[in-house]
């Protein structure tokens, strides 16, 4: 089977170049600093709205109608919500699996971030540092 897929970047892992409106009114350059520059209420509201509107069931239907058979979903290390101040997103991933099943699409889950960042870019969760491999707690 050939995989013909679409990347759903910017949905569950924020990347400022894709989702700049989420960062408006802050100096944050990445997902690490965004919740630290907003009130908890403002952060939760932005994330909740973004996750419910950025990718929807309609997108999965459209992806299938265009002849694709797979989606790639980047997820953060805090997907289960156990790493304050971040908000987990396992419910959204569960929805994605239901939609994919409904439209006959496969899913490739991409663990896209790790604590301390694996690459030092915004798509690693925090810009300017790359300390994941240097902290035994992060690697264990």
Describe each region flagged by the PLM.
Residues 1-68:
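N-terminal carbohydrate-binding accessory modules
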Residues 58-140:
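Substrate-binding cleft and catalytic face of glycoside hydrolase catalytic domains
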């Amino acid at each position: 089977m050939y995989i013909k897929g679409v990347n759903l970047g910017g949905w569950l892992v924020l990347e400022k170049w894709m989702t700049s409106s989420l960062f408006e009114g802050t100096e944050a350059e990445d997902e690490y600093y965004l919740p630290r520059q907003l009130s908890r209420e403002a952060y939760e509201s932005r994330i909740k709205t973004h996750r419910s509107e950025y990718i929807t069931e309609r997108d999965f239907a459209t992806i299938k109608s265009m002849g694709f058979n797979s989606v790639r979903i980047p997820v953060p290390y805090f997907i289960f919500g156990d790493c304050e101040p971040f908000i987990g997103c396992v419910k959204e991933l569960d929805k994605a699996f239901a939609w994919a099943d409904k439209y006959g699409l496969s899913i490739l889950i991409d663990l896209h971030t790790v604590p301390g960042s694996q690459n030092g870019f915004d798509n690693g969760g925090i810009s300017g540092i790359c300390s994941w491999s240097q902290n035994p707690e992060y690697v264990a």
